[in-house]
Amino acid sequence: MQISQERVSGCPKRMVFGPCGGVHDDGSCEMLPTPCVFDQLDGLPVATVGGPDAVAGGRPVEPPGSAWRPPTILTDLSVPPGDAATLQSTARLLAGSCDALLVGDHQDRVDFPPSTLARLIADAGAVPWVTLACRDRNRISLEQELRALALDGLATVLCVTGDGRAYDVRPDVTQAFDLDGTRLAALAASLGLPVAVAETPTARPVALRPRRLVYKQEAGARVGALNHVPGTALLAEFLDAARAAGLRMPVIASVVVFTDQRSADALAALPGLEIAAERRELVLTADDPVEAGIAAAVDEANLLLGMHGVAGVNLSGLASADGVQAAAEIQAEIGRRVREARGVRP
């Protein structure tokens, strides 16, 4: 399979396989005060157009005896950037309550490279998932990082285009966007890496999202990580449409974890993420918001894990404004309760 490199004119992220997950509710672009160019299209670009600069794609050959599988519980690892000691102590705290830890690639802070993060997490006794975004790396840098990850063989790589950097965050730094998430997934798969990809089911243009996830599967992804959907009916509708379009790979559904105003606001500020108003009120007005937040997350996780096609859940969010330790303890408790409900022993 050859992956098209023919960009859609007018996209500031120079995407071929858009739209990104940051399209606003009114159809406007995340980065410019103009309509998203993909929101005005009737369909997606053709995936199999070749050319001299095309990226080879396709599902990698599984090595004999390969034990890779999607995690049932994937927990966000949120720690201060560049702090290896805190990262590893937090990873150790969380390792027994989940199957893998996901570390982000953020637009507003400089952290270790993903390959270094993967080694630090693995050395702490946890299974790493690392996010690799196209925002801050040109194609050569992306290839270098993927080769380092492939050499170590430690991590699943979540390939994303990346959210645009805010106007007041490092205005002296350029944004690359040489590739988008689909083309990056093809490149990663061609190097034999286990590839995860993201999709936002509720972002405009909603009708194009299921097929876009299938394109990423065809590029070589093994699992889709979905942004939060405020209700199982909406998620089921998306998954039905995706399967009708050819989706075969499993998905990981997002569970929002918040226990106070700040952690709720941090989630709400993420592009394409929506928290049901009743869920927010239930947690924030409770006598014990921490327990209410934990219980709500456990209930959502168990509900999602019972859905057809959902292989796992991602415990996503800041969790608590009281610091890294408090947040990790909340995440760990959620993971333990979900495992207990599924009959998994510590």
Question: What do the PLM-derived regions correspond to, one by one?
Answer:
Residues 65-66, 79-81, 162, 172-202, ...:
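Active-site pocket-lining/capping segments in soluble small-molecule metabolic enzymes
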Residues 71-78, 99-103, 128-132, 157-159, ...:
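Hydrophobic faces of well-ordered beta-strands that scaffold small-molecule active sites
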Residues 45-85, 343-346:
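N-terminal amphipathic alpha-helix/helix-capping segment at the start of soluble metabolic enzymes
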Residues 81-94, 139-147, 205-215, 294-303:
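Short, acidic/polar
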Residues 212, 216-217, 308-328:
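Charge-patterned, long linear interaction tracts outside catalytic cores
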Residues 66-67, 91-96, 115-125, 146-154, ...:
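Acidic (Asp/Glu)-rich catalytic clusters
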Residues 84-85, 107-121, 137-145, 163-187, ...:
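Active-site-adjacent beta->alpha loops and helix N-cap segments on the catalytic face
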Residues 1-55:
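Cysteine-cluster motifs in flexible loop/terminal segments that predominantly coordinate metals
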